[in-house]
Swiss-Prot record:
This is Probable WRKY transcription factor 10. Residues 368-380 have a biased composition (Low complexity). Keywords: DNA-binding, Metal-binding, Nucleus, Transcription, Transcription regulation, Zinc. It comes from the Eukaryota. The gene is WRKY10. Residues 216-264 have a biased composition (Acidic residues). One of its GO terms (molecular function) is sequence-specific DNA binding. The keyword Transcription regulation applies. Zn(2+) binds at C332, C337, H361, H363. Transmembrane segments: none annotated. Expressed in male gametophytes (pollen) and in the endosperm of fertilized ovules. GO terms for cellular component: nucleus. It is found in: Nucleus.
């Protein structure tokens, strides 16, 4: 900044004369000089221009000292011989004495000196701007070695001069974090041959992850199925047998499809379902408890649900894939038993009934149900006369006389066994009428039996059962006339 201030103060000292010509006037004078005229000597006479600047600098040393005292540091003198503009060099070449006036290019402002960090150190390196516009292509300037040449930028009259700056060498750090490469092997499921067992010994510490996932899935399915069964028991107790919930019923085909889908997620090439089930069963036997036992029975029967000695409750029915006949689902009625079964007709043979049991009963079979229709009829027949005797005893009447037993057919006479027809002789029915009336019980006759006084209590007149009377009449008709109705 000291050089900058020195140059600026020294140059401002030469700008002081207000009678200095403008740059256009100087250019016009240069053209007249080429024509043989020398108007510069008229404006700047030689007598008033000293050859050396020492006197002028000595005269103005007081201003420089005052500025130095105000700023706080001493300003060195400006050497005008070194900082010479192109116009000043031109004036010296044309035998013009040195002038304190500094020529400034058009458009130049002194304020630019305040904003530029670097002052012009060597005016010989600056290329004067050309008056012609830059419409042509740029000239390529070759630089060799450490020499720096000025280059003209496109659409810019000001020169651009690069500088070689020696930057300090950067230190190379050895502890830069670099990315380490890891080898990640591709996952290839291990498929054992069919002949080798799944689990070789109990001493092995690692088990195949794919089979472990299958076990957990099947166990969760069985547990969820048991929970669903308990929920279904309470849900379908008061409903009709034909109503069911398809979301809670899991049949065999759907279970197989789910197992195959689960294996497909873990193993891109799963083994056949039969082999997979065999492997899973071996795996479970070695580590965990097995699933519920399944028994399949086939028989020919006309009934849709053959009797097997246990009592079942139907909780669902639906049509499965591959069989047009519906499949019925049953559950054991015992509270502690969780055995289920589903019954369906064969797809090819309708007479064939296929029953599949899931689980084993943990209770004995209940006693078989017997048809007690004959015993019920006998007990009903025995209770009717007893009820009649109770009624008659309460009314103070004599019980009816029992009817004689019916004789066997061999004791019938030919006359009694002859058929009754319209061509036969007339039959006297007075005896039958009298005998039938004699069988009727004696009913007392009361006056005004249909009316009742205000303070009288109602009386109950129980009528005997008419079935005994009817039986007695029919027996007499059969014995006397052989009429069987």
């Amino acid at each position: 900044m000291s050089d900058f201030d020195e140059n600026f103060i020294e140059m401002t000292s030469y700008w002081a004369p207000p009678s200095s010509p403008s740059p256009r006037t100087i250019l016009a004078m240069l053209e007249q000089t080429d024509n043989g005229l020398n108007p510069i000597s008229e404006i700047f006479p030689q007598e008033s221009l000293p050859r050396d600047h020492t006197d002028q600098s000595g005269q103005r040393s007081g201003l420089r000292e005052r500025l130095a005292a105000r700023v706080g540091f001493n300003l060195p003198t400006l050497n005008t011989e070194e900082n010479m503009s192109p116009l000043d060099a031109f004036f010296r070449s044309s035998n013009v004495p040195n002038s304190p006036v500094v020529a400034i290019s058009p458009g130049f402002s002194p304020s630019a000196l305040l904003h530029t960090p670097n002052m012009v150190s060597d005016s010989s390196q600056i290329i004067p701007p050309s008056s012609a516009t830059n419409y042509g292509p740029l000239e390529m300037v070759e630089t060799s070695g450490e020499d720096n040449a000025a280059m003209m930028m496109f659409n810019n009259d000001l020169p651009y001069q690069p500088y070689n700056v020696d930057l300090p060498s950067l230190e190379v750090f050895d502890d830069i974090a670099t990315e380490e490469s890891f080898y990640i092997p591709s996952y290839e499921p291990h498929v054992d041959p069919i002949g080798t067992p799944l689990v070789t010994s109990f001493e092995s510490e690692l088990v195949d992850d794919a089979h472990t996932d299958i076990i957990s899935i099947e166990d969760s399915e069985s547990e969820d199925g048991n929970k669903d069964d308990d929920d279904e028991d309470f849900q379908y107790e008061d409903e009709d047998e034909d109503q069911y919930d398809q979301d809670q019923d899991v049949d065999e085909d759907e279970e197989e499809e789910k197992d195959e889908d689960n294996v497909a997620l873990d193993d891109p090439q799963p083994p056949p379902p039969k082999r997979r089930r065999y492997e899973v069963s071996n795996m479970i036997g070695a580590t965990r408890t097995s699933k519920t036992q399944r028994i399949i029975l086939q028989m020919e029967s006309d009934e849709d649900n053959p009797n097997d000695g246990y009592r079942w409750r139907k909780y669902g029915q639906k049509v499965v894939k591959g069989n047009p006949n519906p499949r019925s689902y049953f559950k054991c009625t015992n509270i502690e038993c969780r055995v289920k079964k589903h019954v369906e007709r064969g797809a090819d043979n309708i007479k064939l009934v296929v029953t599949t049991y899931d689980g084993i009963h943990n209770h004995p079979s209940p006693p078989a149900r017997r048809s007690n229709s004959s015993s019920r009829n006998r007990s009903a027949g025995a209770t009717i006369p007893q009820n009649q005797n109770d009624r008659t005893s309460r009314l103070g009447r004599a019980p009816p006389t029992p009817t004689p037993p019916t004789p066997p057919p061999s004791s019938y006479t030919p006359e009694e066994m002859r058929p009754f027809s319209s061509l036969a002789t007339e039959i006297d029915l007075t005896e039958v009428y009298m005998t039938g009336i004699s069988m009727l019980p004696n009913i007392p006759v009361y006056e005004n039996s249909g009316f009742m006084y205000q303070n009288d209590e109602p009386t109950m007149n129980a009528m005997p059962d008419g079935s005994d009377v009817y039986d007695g009449i029919m027996e007499r008709l059969y014995f006397k006339f052989g009429v069987d109705m």
